[in-house]
């Protein structure tokens, strides 16, 4: 008597968990013509294996165009952008700034079971004033792409940044 057993294997892959970082993040307001201001930070940790983070999109509450310029991505060995000497700029990926997003793609960021720390850093346009409409960055797990598995952690909501002119102007 032969019997057949059907086995369904699940290859869900690892879970990548995002968490917000607040140490070293710039306070509001952002001042015209200032540089290298960390506007959002997050960590990414894999439950197993080494999936790659290949893309993510930071949403903005209003357009960041003509407010945030020279946007960069940094990684750090600790969870603070303020710590001197341990922040390294990531290069070699594609970046686009739209009316509602900061889009990072073609990334090859290997993740692991140890948290990896990321900071979105920008210069502040010289033309912003106290009348410039505020902008608030955010990151949802749905806007993060990994090579395998899934992403969890909810929404990371940054500071609602007002703007101001440089002191003495």
What do these predicted regions represent?
Residues 1-169:
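Exposed, polar/acidic Ser/Thr-rich sequence context and nearby capping/turn residues
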């Amino acid at each position: 008597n032969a019997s057949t057993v059907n086995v369904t294997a699940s290859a869900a892959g690892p879970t990548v968990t995002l968490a917000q970082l607040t140490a070293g993040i710039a306070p509001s307001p952002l001042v015209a013509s200032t540089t290298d201001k960390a506007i959002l930070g997050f960590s990414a940790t894999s439950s197993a294996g080494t999936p790659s983070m290949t893309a993510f999109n930071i949403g903005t509450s209003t357009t960041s165009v003509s407010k945030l310029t020279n946007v960069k991505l940094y990684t750090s060995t600790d969870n603070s952008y303020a710590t001197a000497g341990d922040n390294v700029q990531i290069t070699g990926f594609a970046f686009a700034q739209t009316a509602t997003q900061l889009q990072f793609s073609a990334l090859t960021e290997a993740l692991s079971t140890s948290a990896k720390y990321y900071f979105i850093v920008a210069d502040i346009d010289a033309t912003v004033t106290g009348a410039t409409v505020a902008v608030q960055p955010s990151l949802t797990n749905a806007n993060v792409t990994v090579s395998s598995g899934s992403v969890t952690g909810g929404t990371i909501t940054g500071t609602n940044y007002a703007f101001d002119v440089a002191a003495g102007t």
